[in-house]
Design a protein with these regions (language model features):
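C-terminal substrate-binding subdomain of Rossmann-fold SDR/epimerase-dehydratase oxidoreductases
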Residues: 5, 18, 31-32, 38, ...
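Short secondary-structure boundary micro-motifs
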Residues: 82-83, 200, 208-209, 291-293, ...
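N-terminal Rossmann-like NAD(P)+-binding domain of SDR-like oxidoreductases, especially those catalyzing
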Residues: 1-200, 240, 250, 269, ...
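Conserved GTPase G-domain signal focused on the G5
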Residues: 204
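A glycine/serine/threonine-rich, flexible loop-to-helix segment
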Residues: 49, 156, 207-215, 276
Length: 364
């Protein structure tokens, strides 16, 4: 069955991998990539599919409600996969309102547009029995983060039932957007699904996050700034595995439900950085241990959660998903991609990136 799917944030890191998968795997679908092309949005990420007959790019901002209305009307949007977001914790500490506008107000704009455009197809008769009854098949799929759950202790995993406890402006804004999506499901009977993922890594990642930032710095023999004692722990998920999970949840997930997507793959920051240094030294032909000399411990950031770890058992048992790439394999492939795409890396790290980098990491 044909669909007209709006993917927001489709020129970004995760979004571009989702767009590529949907365009190539489902030729009967028309895929509309909506992106404002802010600093992390890059159409070069999608050059390989830009001429595909079922791919369409729309430059717009989810804060523009009128633009959203026009897009839904013009393209008869049947489904939404919502990835557009401000996503970097450090930036949220500097400019929290930017995160409120995009992640909260932008999401509500999108929800309102979907609700109004699809209302003739949605039945309001089954208000309280937990079922969805629509004449047509619609879905508003909201992609979120494990950071909404707060910080874990040394034991345990985040489950779909874990209470929210956000500790940064970023995670607070994403928690608010999650709540709005579920509220629209309950109040207006909008067919929704939510997923919360762990830390992603892979090709096309803007170098403000740990792995691409440190790859860039190792290439250029710049300091590797590690926050605090380096023992903060994260669960890492290869972005292509995440895109596979999104595809599966979109097609087979239960409407109204939440799914956690994780890599079952915990690393402390310092151990990850040392592994990265080892692999980079081998690939760059450097002396073993050379890049580790670049590690510099810097002042911790405010509200730094100690540990995140996702329990993706529900997704595995109900839909059969599991990660297909080991961390060592994924990291090696990621490094290779950046080494083979140095022009892309230098292009995205010019201009305003340097101002931001100096503000965040110089003289800490």
């Amino acid at each position: 069955m044909g669909k007209n799917i709006l993917i927001t944030g489709g020129a970004g890191f995760i979004g571009s991998h989702v767009v590529r998968l949907m365009v190539t795997k489902y030729p009967a679908y028309q895929i509309f990539n909506l992106d404002a092309l802010t600093y992390a949005g890059n159409l070069e990420n999608l050059k390989d599919i830009e001429n595909a007959p079922n791919y369409h790019f729309v430059k717009a901002n989810i804060l523009d409600a009128e633009a959203l209305k026009d897009i839904f009307t013009k393209h008869n949007i049947t489904d939404v996969i919502h990835l557009a977001a401000e996503s970097h914790v450090d930036r949220s500490i500097i400019s929290p309102l930017d995160f409120v506008y995009t992640n909260v107000i932008g999401t509500v704009n999108l929800l309102n547009t979907a609700k109004d455009f699809w209302k003739q197809d949605l039945s309001y008769e089954n208000a309280h029995d937990g079922t969805w009854d629509s004449k047509r098949d619609h879905l508003f799929y909201h992609i979120s983060t494990d950071e909404v759950y707060g910080s874990l202790g040394k034991e345990g995993l985040f489950k779909e039932t874990t209470p929210y406890d956000p500790n940064s402006p970023y995670s607070a804004s994403k928690a608010a957007s999650d709540h709005f999506v579920r509220a629209y499901g309950e109040t207006y009977h909008l067919p929704i699904v939510v997923s919360n993922c762990s830390n992603n890594y892979g090709p096309n990642h803007f170098p403000e996050k740990l792995i691409p930032l440190f790859i860039h710095n190792i290439i250029n023999k710049k300091a590797l700034p590690v926050y605090g004692d380096g023992l903060y722990t994260r669960d890492w998920l290869y972005v292509i595995d995440h895109a596979r999970a999104i595809d599966l949840i979109f097609h087979e997930g239960k409407k109204g439900d939440t799914y956690n997507i994780g890599g079952f793959n915990e690393w402390t920051n310092i151990d990850l950085v040392k592994l990265l240094c080892t692999q980079m030294d081998e690939k760059l032909g450097r002396t073993k241990g050379e890049s580790e000399q670049l590690i510099t411990y810097v002042k911790d950031r405010p509200g730094h959660d100690r540990r995140y770890a996702i329990d993706a058992t529900k997704l595995n048992k109900e839909l059969g998903w599991s990660p297909s790439v080991s961390f060592e394999q994924g990291l090696a492939a990621t490094i290779d991609w950046y080494l083979q795409n140095t022009a892309w890396l230098e292009n995205v790290t010019s201009g305003t990136y340097q101002t931001y980098y100096n503000q965040m990491y110089t003289n800490r």
